[in-house]
Each structure stands twice: as structure tokens, then as C-alpha cells.
Curated annotation (Swiss-Prot):
Cofactor-binding details, from the entry: Binds 1 zinc ion per subunit.
UniProt-recorded name of the protein: Alanine--tRNA ligase
Entry's free-text remark on domains: Consists of three domains; the N-terminal catalytic domain, the editing domain and the C-terminal C-Ala domain. The editing domain removes incorrectly charged amino acids, while the C-Ala domain, along with tRNA(Ala), serves as a bridge to cooperatively bring together the editing and aminoacylation centers thus stimulating deacylation of misacylated tRNAs.
UniProt-listed Enzyme Commission number(s): 6.1.1.7
Amino acid sequence: MLTVNDIRQKFLGYFKNYNHQEIPSSSLIPRDDPSLLFTNAGMVQFKKVFTGQETRNYLRATTAQKCLRVGGKHNDLENVGRTARHHTFFEMLGNFSFGDYFKKEAIQFAWAFITEELNLSKEFLYITIYKDDDDAYDIWVNTIGVEPSRIYRMGEKDNFWSMGDTGPCGPCSEIHFDQGETFCCGDNCGIGSCDCDRFLEIWNLVFMQYEQLPSGERVILPKPSIDTGMGLERIVAICQQKSSNYDTDLFQPIIQYMASIAGVHYKKHEETDIALRVIADHSRAIAFMIADGILPSNEGRGYVLRRLIRRAFRFGKQIGMNQPFLYKTVNKVVELMGDIYTELYSRSEFMSRVVFDEEERFSITLDKGLILLEAELNALKEKNTKELPGDIAFKLYDTYGFPLDIINDIASKKHFAVDEANFQHLMQEQKERARSQWKGSGEKRIEACFQTLLEDGMQSEFIGYENLSGTGRIVALLDIDGLPIEELPTKSSGYVITDMTPFYGTSGGQTGDIGILSTITGKTQVVDTLKPATNLIVHVVTVTSGTILLDQEALLVVSESERLDTARNHTCTHILQSVLQKILGDHVRQAGSLVSPTRLRFDFTHIAPLTEEEIHAIELQVNTIIMANLPLRVEFMDQQSALEKGAMALFEEKYGNIVRVVTIGSENQTASIELCGGTHLTSTGQAGCFIIVSETGIAAGVRRIEAITGRNTLAYIKEYQKELSTTAAILKTKPEKVVEKVTSILSENKNLQKTVDTLESSSLSNQGKHLLDNLTRINNIDVLTANLKNFSLKALRDIMDDIRSKLSSGIVCLASTEGTKVHLLLYVSKDLHHNFTASELIKKIVVPIHGAGGGRPDQAQAGGTNPSGLSETFELLKNILEDQ
């Protein structure tokens, strides 16, 4: 029997034999494609090739692509685990032609692979084509020899593919496998008439032969292309003669492992089976998402990951798993697939810790949320209502972190619907509140005016890699509100665009340059430089003298010292990332950065706070590279070549086909290689020195290092020396003896504190004895009330403990005031609990002090904000006892 690895390798090897370039799977995070949350098909990494925006050094390609479909129109989440073939994560096998071969070859390749390489019987194969695609029909019948009765013509919905409203599109042809009558859904079962599993689509061949214009007209492409996709999970199930994808060697090891740790059996109870299948599916998705740099969060891709972890955890709870377990099943995925996808192995330890932490956090809120949901559903049941209100669903989402699909799952099992319309309304209101509070709302208005300039063909040429000064013509002037103007008068601020500039605009985490822009009629201070688009650089200026006019020639001079400081920090950011990966592990990925003249800030994926030893080692290694005075070199090359060379790139960052590669070190000693458009030093020695000033956590699994370089380190060290000298003077010692002196003082202080505690304990004991002299008797009950001013709550408790040890029966109410705060303790001995309990009594007497409290039957505590009400509180207690 063919294993999954056999089939994957057979597919790739088959097409390599026909001159296809094997291309590694791209990340689940689509590069340069803001329209997609995740890579959901094999063609995604080739989209720009198909649209003609990019060229590659090959015309044929084959891939096994990691894909994820959770959300949007490709949302399989609700069906996962309930059907034989729905998954969140899956692998798409594909072969592609970029203007090389077309329909005939694509069909021949597919048919030969299925019937000869996989040995699937032709009698079980059926074909669908687009209704007007006579070419495909002719190839299937006359070249391949498929009987016409096995070919079905389908409409545009089923057999015509398009990339969007415009762009490449074309008919497609699907190969279906007949799984037999046992899968039949009834009398109307058949291709195109039902959605059951009998006639299972296994391979889709897309013939990109048209371009759809904005008018809706379709014109023939000069170089038609091929895009095919075959789901690995489906073809494995067929080859292994399994009725469900979950019964194959892709899923069974995970399912059986999960069943063993949960103490349950697969294929005994349907609900248990669903839970096991969901956990197996989600474990695969979770592992690959984290391996590709996605971390749990409350938005975007991170929120999808969080949903999957929480959903799988809840299904685990249904089969008796009350402790974290997903981190174990995720490791099983690594064990199964790490040899093929090595990124799983390199991040396995990090992955386990992220998942474990997320499970622990969710388990804390899950029980509370489930109790609330259960109570709400029971209340609705009593009212004979079958819909959970949207505000309750939103509270579960907002307060307890319950995704809507989890709420729907639980509600539907109890035959309740959820008012999703009101839920979405409340969600939208929350988003609008967030938008209205966002401080950058003015920025959007400015961006709109820059967009207008771009649409008018406005461009700026950046000459700042080689030059810190230059001349350019002023091609646009905007006032501070972004409105176009003819002149910018003295003392005013605005935006200046020149046709060429040495000023670097904010991008890639690097802040914009500052400097001087002047003309024959005026002078400005450039306080910032923006880069709203690839070819547009905008100078933010304040006119210091004269007037700046549109269409003038301007002299632009970048502040050399500020640029150099920024370059120091940027180069050290590259060195830092490389060092972090060497010391902490390959799981370290950049999660954000800021490079300015004064400091660098680097966010990276790592689960635990750095130890002092790790921080010291990182600092030492970065400074070692600085002192080695390694050269920096900049090269331009195509993106694919750069990545193959080992250059690090941010998946969220937008890169062109030709990229700028910054390499630190020589051929024999490379410290770092990254895609980067920023400004850098020419050698590492120019950085001078590197000091980490802080290391903090900013999100689950994300740490932040802030550091300084160059002359900023000198200022930092000088300030430290000054503080150390001042501290030494106060302590009357030498700077090098400060630690020794402070240690001695702390030790002395500790001994003194012990003496104070002993004296205070004795004093409090005496205080207790003294208070017992003031006992009064009400209705045969010994009662003590006392206001002890300026005692801490701890001291009050110690006095109460002393009194309790000496009073066998009675009621004691002690109070203390600290400013406007009131502390209240109430004790009721056990023999009086048939009439009074401390927890009930305290609630009746705290109103005068504007307080609230509670506790146990024997002792309760309250806090208040009205010290003047204490006498009334004591009087209230006495009245209650007298009335009993």
C-alpha cells in the first residue's frame, strides 16, 4: 500500500521527469497578497507570474503546497470532523505551466499519473468540463480515449475559474473518482446533482486562456497557462482504499495517540470520533501556523490560530481532557511530518510552549464561560425561547474569549439558535468605538491626498543610498491638512514632494530622515520624511524663513549625524536578529521593529523572558561582531535567488521581483543576510558599541528588546556613572563598593525588621488584652467594638487573632482608618452561629461606612470610604443584637 509520503514523492518526481521545477511550499502567510488571510491554493505563490507582473527562470513548476481554509468563502471549519473530507489544513499537489504547454499536455499528464503511476482503474474515473469547452472534450475523447458517457458538461459556477472580477481566467476540467454505491445519497445521486462523496473530485485542471476586462469582456491571452490542484488527503484515501481521509496514515497516528491519552476508543461512539477527528485536524493546522510564524492574538491570523486552539481544547474537554493536551498532539504532527517540512522540527519546542500556555490561559476562562452559557440556556428553556440573545453571545466572546463558532456548537447541541445578527451588530459597534478613539484618524485623510498624487502620476526618485545631499524640483506642495497649495509661507508647516531626494522615507521599520530643504526664496526644517507608496517620498517641513514655491529648484541636505545614528541601529538590528537565532534557536522570527537615530526596538517570537545570562551572551556576541569590523555589501537580485541564498525576509513585508540584499560579513564569515531597503553602515565597526537597555514581553510568545548603539551608548554609560557616583556619595562609600554597601545595609535592615516585628507582636498582644477589658454584654452575648486608628489591615488581623485565642464566646467588631479608607473585621464565635454569622452580619452594618464585604460564618471583612460612619456601624451592630 502506498503511504502518504510515497504518493507525495511520486507526484513531484513524476513532474520533475517532465522538466518541471520542484518549488518548495510557500508559507501559509501569503507574500505580497493583502487579499488573502492564508495561502489557500497551490497557485497563490505564482499569482504574479500568471498575471504577468513577475517572471521566473522556469516555465514549468510542481509543488506540494501547505494550505489553510478557515474563514471567508473557503470556510470548512463547521464541517471538520463531521465529514470524511473537510479539513482546515491540507496539502495541495499541483503542476503549473507559465505560457509553455496547455490543455492537451495538462490532460495527458494528469491521466497518465492517475492511471499508470497510481494504478487507479479507468472504470471508476469520470470527467467534467466547461459546457462550451469543445477543445477539452475533444482531447478527453479522441486523445485520451475516455467514453463520451463519462464526460459531463457543467456550467460556469462549477467549471469556470477566475482570479477575481478582472484578470486571468478560464474553463477547468475535473477528474472524479466513483467510490461506489455505498456512498450514494439517493435516487438523484450523480455528478452535478448532489454533493455526496460517491463521485469524489480528486483533480482540477484549470486552463487559463482568457483575460477578463473591467467591461466584462473576455479576450484570449497571448500565452495561456495551466494551474492544477489535487488534494493530497483525498488521493491518499482513495489509494489506501479508505472511506474517510481520517482513516489514512495522515491522520490515524494522531487520532490513535489522542485516543490513548484520553482513555477512549476510536469508532465506538460518534461524538467521541468527531472530537478525535477535530483534534487531529486542528493539531496539524496549529503546528504549521506556528511554524510559519503565526502566534495567538486577538486579530487577523493570530485570532484564527487562537480559535483553533480553543476549539480543539473544548473538544478535548468533551472526551474528558481537563488539562492541556494539544501541545502533545502538535508534537505528534512534528514527528509525522517534520522530515518533509523541516520548519516543524526547527520550531517544535517553541511550538509546544506556545500551545501549552494558550491552553492553560483558556482553561481558566472556559469553565466560567461554560457556567454562564449553561445558566443562560437553562433560563431560556424555562421561558420556552429557542434563541440565545446576541448580547449574551457577545459577552461570552468579549469577556471569556469564546469564538462565535464555539458558542454556536454548544447552543446547537442543546437545540438553540444564536442571534448572530445582533452579535455582529455589537461587534461592529465595538469596532467603530475603537476607530473613533484611534489617534491616527487624521493620517487617513492625508493618505487620501497622497493617493490622488499617485493617480496623477507623481513620483520621487530616491538617491539617498549614495548621497546625503542633492537638488530636486518641487513637484507638489500641500498644507498641513493635505490640501494642494502654490506656496508655503514662513512659520507654516506642510508637505513638500520633489522629483528626486536623498531623504529616506519611513518604511521597513526605519524612521524617516530629517534635515534642511531650501530654495532661493526660503528655507525649511525637514522634521520627518514619509513614504506613502513605493515611488513617492514626502518631506514634512516647517518653513523657518522666507517662502517655498511650487516648481522651484530645491537643495536637499540630510542630517549626516542623524542618518549615521539610524544606520548604526539598523545594522545592529540585523546583527541582533542573527545572534538571537544562534543563541535562542531557529524559532526566533522578527515580529516587528523600529529603527530610529536614538534607539532600536526589536520584537521577536520567543516564549519565555530572557535570563540575565542570555542577555549578556546576546550583548557580547553582537559586540564581538561589531569589533570584528566586518564589511557590509549590498546587492540587487531577483527575490527567488535571494531567498535561495538564505536571505531572511518578512512574510508581511512587500517586496518587488528585484530585491535589495544586505549581507554583513565576507563570503567565509557571514553574520547576517537579509532583504532590506534601509540605510546601513559600510562596516560593523562603525556601530561602536551595543547595549540592551530593556527586555520585555508584549504579547503571548512575543518578546521585545530595546537597545542603543554608537554615541547613544556613551551618553547612557555617562548617565550610569553619574548615578553610581551620586549613590556612592549618599552611601559614603566608593563607586566600586556600592553593591557591597547596599548588601550590608539590607542585611542590617532585615535584622532590624525582625526586632520591630517582635516588638510589634508584643504590642499587639498587649493591645488585644487591653481591648478585652472593654467587653460589654448584650442579650447574654459578650460584645466588643473598637476603632483602632492608623492600624494596617495586617495589624488589625493580628489583633483579631489574639482576641479570638482568648475569647471562647462572643462577637468582636474591629475597625481601623487610614485616611479615607476604612477596614472592618467581624468575628462571631461558633456557638452563636445558630443566630448570627459574620458573613451575614457584616452586610447589614457596612452601609454607614459606604462599604461592602463578606466572608466565612466565623470571620468576615469589609472595606469602606466613610470613616465618619463608624460609630453608626457599631451602633447598628448593637441594635441588631439587642433586637434578637
